[in-house]
């Protein structure tokens, strides 16, 4: 199975779209892995592939009767076991926490929908053409031009500030303190996060700290520092707090997790089981 990740090239898209990856699986041998919570909103498109979600399991299978499939994943709190069966052709877009709102005015209607993600009239046709394109360079031009054509002027001053505050790992501001600072209520903050981010602020912060820990782990490995230092640098209160958070988000202790995960540029998304 071949996976290529690309950072967004166009400066106009960079504030909203972190990047995208192209996945090709030609072998009939099944691949299974665990993927872990993150704060991106992911949109995946497939050609001749069926996707079935049940609890914390996703089965992605070759299906020659399905010309096009598209899904949106906004939030999950525990690992998802993913099985790839047969030949797979996939493109996945990784939008920043508020990013997709700048393309869709009513994003929240898709968060809990079981229907295929088809946000625009020309979406299926364009994404199918992208999936069928053999050149990565041409694919990148096509997909970035498409998302640029859908870009709108979404702007929410309060929410932008709240998300920025939550991303500050060197400060531990409570939701109550944020409500006081921005003259709003805890309830309104929860409502805004649920509507525009797809998860509550507590989960958002916990996942962000976890992801920061993955990123910092690379630097600590270079410096030969231990996991206790990692916990402090990622703003976990103590070692037991870090262990609890890791078990909640990954199903593993930090030691087990870091022994099995492939860390590359702090991504740490996949834990292959077979």
Predicted regions and their residues:
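Alpha-helical bundle regulatory/interaction domains
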Residues: 1-170, 174-176, 182-186, 199-200, ...
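Basic, Lys/Arg-rich alpha-helical nucleic-acid-recognition elements, primarily the DNA-binding modules
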Residues: 183, 194, 210
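Alpha-helical DNA-contacting segments of helix-turn-helix folds
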Residues: 197-215, 245, 249-262
């Amino acid at each position: 199975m071949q996976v290529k990740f690309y950072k967004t090239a166009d400066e106009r898209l960079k504030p909203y779209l972190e990047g995208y990856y192209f996945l090709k699986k030609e072998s009939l041998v099944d691949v299974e892995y665990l993927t872990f919570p993150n704060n991106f909103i992911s949109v995946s498109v497939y050609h001749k592939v069926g996707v079935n979600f049940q609890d914390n399991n996703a089965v992605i299978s070759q299906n020659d009767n399905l010309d096009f499939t598209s899904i949106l994943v906004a939030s999950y709190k525990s690992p998802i076991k993913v099985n790839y069966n047969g030949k797979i052709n996939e493109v996945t877009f990784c939008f920043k926490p508020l990013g997709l709102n700048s393309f869709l005015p009513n994003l929240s209607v898709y968060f809990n929908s079981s229907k295929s993600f088809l946000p625009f009239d020309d979406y299926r046709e364009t994404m199918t053409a992208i999936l069928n394109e053999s050149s990565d360079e041409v694919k990148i031009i096509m997909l970035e031009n498409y998302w640029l054509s859908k870009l709108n002027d979404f702007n929410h001053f309060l929410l932008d500030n709240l998300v920025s505050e939550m991303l500050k790992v060197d400060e531990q501001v409570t939701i109550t303190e944020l409500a006081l600072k921005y003259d709003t209520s805890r309830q309104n903050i929860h409502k805004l996060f649920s509507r525009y981010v797809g998860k509550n602020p507590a989960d958002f912060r916990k996942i962000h700290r976890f992801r920061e820990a993955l990123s910092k782990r690379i630097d600590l490995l270079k410096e030969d520092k231990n996991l206790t230092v990692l916990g402090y640098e990622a703003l976990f209160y103590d070692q037991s707090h870090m262990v609890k958070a890791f078990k909640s988000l990954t199903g593993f202790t930090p030691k087990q997790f870091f022994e099995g995960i492939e860390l590359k540029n702090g991504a740490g998304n996949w834990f292959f089981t077979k």
